[in-house]
Amino acid sequence: MKKVSTWMYTLMQPIASFLLKIVYQPKIINKQAIPKEGRIILAGNHKMLLDPVLVSCGTRRLIHFLAKDVFFTGVRGFFMRRAGTLPVHSGKIHKDSFKSAIDILNQNKVVGIFPEGTRNYTEKQLLPFKRGAVTLAQETGSKIIPFAIHGRYLPFHGLRIEFGKPIEVESMDLKEANQLLEDEVRKLLDKAEKEKAGEKNKK
């Protein structure tokens, strides 16, 4: 396996996480769902470029995120490659990235994926999930921890992330596994909406 550089993540993640917590004061729910060791895939919805930092607030473990290859250019690409990020080509996991992700998981590390494949700028709650997360889970026997990011990306406006219970998809049909993951993320988003509505009614 080609060594994946991570020194930039180790250096910058604590700083970025600290600043995000000060500015946005996000509510982080059920972060104990992420085990302190073992191979894990974190998978959830995607709205903004800040999402990887927000997800990383839930664990001290280093997360190898997958990102579009178009971001791997110039200065930004330099930093992303040294933050342990793996490129995704044309909306699909490139075979080299897929192999790298498998190797990372087989070393009992953490991979982060946004199964929508892009940031969701629509009014829809979720875009259709691509199958990269469940495919990796089945290839490596990894559990998937779904997460849902909810709220406005403005300072002090109730931004939150909730991690769900780990799901196992190793013995499932790929299509059914992908639907299960999407359903679990949707449940977390629905829960956040209900809680937000309840808070408004109390005012």
Question: Residues of each region from the PLM?
Answer:
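Catalytic core of membrane glycerolipid acyltransferases/transacylases, capturing the structured
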Residues: K21, K36-K92
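Small-molecule pocket liners
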Residues: Y24, I63, L159
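Structural motif corresponding to alpha-helix initiation and N-cap regions
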Residues: I28, T73, K95-F98
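A generic structural signal for well-ordered alpha-helical segments
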Residues: L19, G58, M80, I104, ...
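Helix-to-loop junction immediately C-terminal to a conserved catalytic motif
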Residues: P14-N45, K109
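Non-catalytic C-terminal accessory region of glycerolipid acyltransferases
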Residues: K2-W7, D96-K203
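Short acidic-hydrophobic, aromatic-tinged amphipathic segments that line or gate anion-handling sites
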Residues: I28-I29, L86-H89, V169
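Short hydrophobic helices that act as membrane-entry/anchoring signals
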Residues: K2-Y24, G77, R81-G84, V88
